[in-house]
Amino acid sequence: MEFVKDLKTPEDYINNELKYGAHNYDPIPVVLKRAKGVFVYDVNDKRYYDFLSAYSSVNQGHCHPNILNAMINQAKNLTICSRAFFSVPLGICERYLTNLLGYDKVLMMNTGAEANETAYKLCRKWGYEVKKIPENMAKIVVCKNNFSGRTLGCISASTTKKCTSNFGPFAPQFSKVPYDDLEALEEELKDPNVCAFIVEPIQGEAGVIVPSDNYLQGVYDICKKYNVLFVADEVQTGLGRTGKLLCVHHYNVKPDVILLGKALSGGHYPISAVLANDDIMLVIKPGEHGSTYGGNPLAASICVEALNVLINEKLCENAEKLGGPFLENLKRELKDSKIVRDVRGKGLLCAIEFKNELVNVLDICLKLKENGLITRDVHDKTIRLTPPLCITKEQLDECTEIIVKTVKFFDERF
């Protein structure tokens, strides 16, 4: 393109983005131009292991040929027609998703934030029409340190100052309880105006916080006791990331509502979904909720193939098989580190928490980049380790060496 012929070096691309784009992100200084499988490549063609996976969007690996072909083939025929009409791909996608996960209905949207916003509306409406909560009194309970997006509804449910500072006033009737605290949850759910409890099975953005083994079963039981909808936000934890198709499957519970996003397209297109049974989903009537792009034919075709890849290539099983040894190897190699506070995770949703009073975690990310692996810090103290689920044992062993080598580089300062 003639108008960008001045862009040649990584610095040129970085400065161009900073000049013309809003400063709502603070990226690691690497300029990526292509990707394949578990690898991304910068403008100088240096290869990196991707250990962020677009926040678990590319569970199937970057640019998977089957998903890409499904996308191209559908784009040649029909990309969008709006929900004013029926389309062939949408019904197929809806049937596949509901049968796969065991729910009556699915409502397709575009982003994880939209899935959460949809859940807020769905649960409130169910609260008024089924639970008979007085008008405008419906309350939704969420966990402290959750992350569901940055729309106004989502930040109304947030306790993260960076998300909420100077963005008020907020949507009312969100109550926050500590994560992994059943006693606090039960106390809150005694309020008859509570319609729903929305929870991440593992808190991702909080730093990969894994709850007690009995937590989600306890959540299920308490929600049933007080006639409150149990909503599992599986946008980040779902679709194989933790070693099961859904993270809640580890705990043998079935929430009333499931929220999905990210890997629903394998990173090729924004797709999200809300799943529930008829007694919940059908409180929403025509015209009461929707999206121009939600459930478009292109998204539906991509979604079906992304799920096919996940299942046919046994990526859930791969995450479960490799995740445990990966975590144990890191714990063993880093147990004597002066700067590591904790190593934790489930499947291939893992993290290392550092003693941020001793080390700048951003510096660790930059050193990892130098050593051929990219990821990002969370809350200035934790780095996320979430490779695509197609990673092999040999590749994961190499990445373990990179991570250990990087941590030991900083350990040598003490």
Swiss-Prot record:
Q: Which cofactor does it need?
A: pyridoxal 5'-phosphate
One MF annotation (Gene Ontology) recorded for this entry: pyridoxal phosphate binding
Modification N6-(pyridoxal phosphate)lysine occurs at: K262
Q: How is it modified after translation?
A: The disulfide bond between Cys-154 and Cys-163 is reduced by TRX1 which increases OAT catalytic activity.
Lineage top rank: taxon: Eukaryota
**SS bonds (residue pairs):** C154-C163
- Determine if Transcription regulation is one of this entry's keywords: no
Enzyme Commission no: 2.6.1.13
Enzyme class label:
transferase
* Catalytic function, reaction form: a 2-oxocarboxylate + L-ornithine = L-glutamate 5-semialdehyde + an L-alpha-amino acid; L-ornithine + 2-oxoglutarate = L-glutamate 5-semialdehyde + L-glutamate
User: A single GO CC term, please?
Assistant: cytoplasm
Record Pfam families: Aminotran_3 (PF00202)
Its UniProt pathway annotation is: Amino-acid biosynthesis; L-proline biosynthesis; L-glutamate 5-semialdehyde from L-ornithine: step 1/1
The listed locations are: Cytoplasm
Q: Which GO terms describe its biological process?
A: arginine catabolic process to glutamate; arginine catabolic process to proline via ornithine; L-proline biosynthetic process
Q: What is its main location?
A: cytoplasm
Assembly description? Homodimer.
Q: Which NCBIfam families match?
A: Orn_aminotrans (TIGR01885)
Tell me the protein family, please: Belongs to the class-III pyridoxal-phosphate-dependent aminotransferase family.
Protein function: Catalyzes the transamination of alpha-ketoglutarate with ornithine or N-acetylornithine and of glutamate-5-semialdehyde with glutamate and alanine.
Q: What is this protein called?
A: Ornithine aminotransferase
Q: Which organism is it from?
A: Plasmodium yoelii yoelii
Per the record, the gene is OAT
